[in-house]
């Protein structure tokens, strides 16, 4: 991934996949929805997309083989239709599955929610997977970037934010870090974002709560934006992408780039 232009990354929230409680047995419908949302991001002028198994709640810490297989099929179909750089995030924290899928379809990056440290989540205690991921990257070398959350949302953290950020980079091997609010769609703490930008030797992305009202404030303190709630119909995460909202945000980003 290139971050010199502060990329706008759209989240494709997938409906339930095989292996999750909500799966209805229609993978073709999942594929159609994913391609439709991805195409809207592309038409709107976004710079990249990331696929996420958002519909698989309640989440497990890692996913089964059937989910990995189905996710790979969906991601490959999206890649065939969409020209944008593509990322993979496998909830809740399956970095091995995410990298494996990304490697198999030649995706560009993955997102890891807990790369280092410990997060107290609704799935219980989630531990970092940096060592396992580093070993896999050695066995399957590629140019896939690792974008890692620092104090990921929907979790409680007892570590110091600055130490957690530096550990994620220096000990976890993150190629970029992500700062989020406390929940999906919630705004980031501006002081945490400023701190991250000040001390991080790698790009810093805003990972939640981005909208036309606050992106101007975040612009100077970030190197990119991951957006998935405000750009949906009615601003609801589970809805389809709104081409009008996505276009509005993309045009605003373009104007900010132009100064």
Swiss-Prot record:
Superkingdom of source: Archaea
Pfam families: BtpA
InterPro entries to which the protein is assigned, alphabetical: BtpA, RibuloseP-bd_barrel
Stored PANTHER family: SGC REGION PROTEIN SGCQ-RELATED, ZGC:162297
Similarity comment: Belongs to the BtpA family.
Protein name, UniProt field: Uncharacterized protein PH1209
Species in which this protein is naturally found: Pyrococcus horikoshii (strain ATCC 700860 / DSM 12428 / JCM 9974 / NBRC 100139 / OT-3)
């Amino acid at each position: 991934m290139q971050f010199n232009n502060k990329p706008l990354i759209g989240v494709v929230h997938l409906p339930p996949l095989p292996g999750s409680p909500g799966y209805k047995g229609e993978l073709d419908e999942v594929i159609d929805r994913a391609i439709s949302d991805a195409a809207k991001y592309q038409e709107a002028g976004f710079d990249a997309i990331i696929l996420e198994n958002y519909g698989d709640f309640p989440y497990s810490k890692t996913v089964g083989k059937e989910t990995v297989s189905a996710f790979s099929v969906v991601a490959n179909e999206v890649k065939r239709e969409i020209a944008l750089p593509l990322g993979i995030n496998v909830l809740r924290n399956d970095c091995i599955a995410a990298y494996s899928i990304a490697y198999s379809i030649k995706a560009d990056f993955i997102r890891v929610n807990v790369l280092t440290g410990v997060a107290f989540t609704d799935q219980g205690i989630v531990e970092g997977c940096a060592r396992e991921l580093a070993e896999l990257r050695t066995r399957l070398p590629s140019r896939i970037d690792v974008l890692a959350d620092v104090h990921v949302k929907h979790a409680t953290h007892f570590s110091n934010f600055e130490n957690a950020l530096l550990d994620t980079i220096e000990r976890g091997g993150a190629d970029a870090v992500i700062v989020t609010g406390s929940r999906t769609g919630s705004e980031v703490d501006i002081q945490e974002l400023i701190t991250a930008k000040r001390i991080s030797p790698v790009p810093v992305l805003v990972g939640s709560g981005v909208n036309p009202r606050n992106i101007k404030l975040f612009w100077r303190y970030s190197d990119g934006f991951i957006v998935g709630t405000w750009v949906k119909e009615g601003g609801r995460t589970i809805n389809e992408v709104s081409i009008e909202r996505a276009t509005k945000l993309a045009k605003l980003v373009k104007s900010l780039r132009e100064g």
